[in-house]
């Protein structure tokens, strides 16, 4: 029954969501939705066949994926929560991060986040990169005048050729300030 069942999580504004194991890795879910929470942590890998929808979480609290996130579509609503993708990711369709809290892409140099259709992150209040962001020949736009990019690892990579698989690549736009976290180490 792969891709036929959905899970919607609503802990209200006072309750946290904690998933300590994998979700959808044995048989993928159709959709995972976080309707509301006072923070959500997914410790294991999350796999869906259709989408992951992040509707709302209390402002300045985080929705955190510590395992790999695999989904065709990732949708974030224009709310003030933070989003943390720590375990790598494979997302098929273009992603436009609409949430207005912070965005963290990776927490280790070995993390690889493939946004196969490209990505735009100009609405978050700040973007932190540690690891590799890849696309398969699709554009990447990180930051704007109000959204800085912070490099958290010693080497951060933005690669629109998917490690050479799409030789032509695509444009990379860094629209805001780009800084490291430790002087002379990034």
Regions found by a protein language model. Name each.
Residues 1-186:
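Extracellular lectin-like interaction modules
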């Amino acid at each position: 029954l792969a891709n036929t069942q959905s899970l919607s999580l609503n802990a209200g504004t006072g309750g946290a969501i904690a998933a300590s194991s994998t979700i959808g890795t044995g048989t993928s879910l159709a959709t995972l939705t976080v309707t509301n929470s006072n923070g959500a942590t997914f410790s294991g890998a999350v796999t869906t066949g259709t989408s992951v929808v992040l509707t709302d979480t209390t402002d300045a609290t985080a929705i955190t994926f510590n395992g790999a996130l695999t989904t065709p579509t990732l949708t974030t609503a224009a709310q003030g929560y933070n989003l943390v993708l720590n375990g790598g990711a494979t997302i098929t369709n273009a992603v436009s991060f609409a949430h207005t809290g912070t965005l963290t892409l990776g927490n280790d140099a070995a993390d690889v986040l493939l946004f196969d259709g490209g990505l735009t992150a100009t609405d978050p209040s700040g973007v932190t990169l540690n690891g590799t962001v890849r696309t398969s020949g699709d554009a990447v736009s990180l930051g704007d005048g109000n959204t800085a990019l912070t490099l958290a690892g010693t080497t951060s990579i933005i690669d629109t050729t998917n490690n050479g698989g799409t030789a032509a690549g695509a444009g990379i736009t860094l629209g805001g300030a780009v800084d490291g976290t430790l002087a002379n180490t990034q």
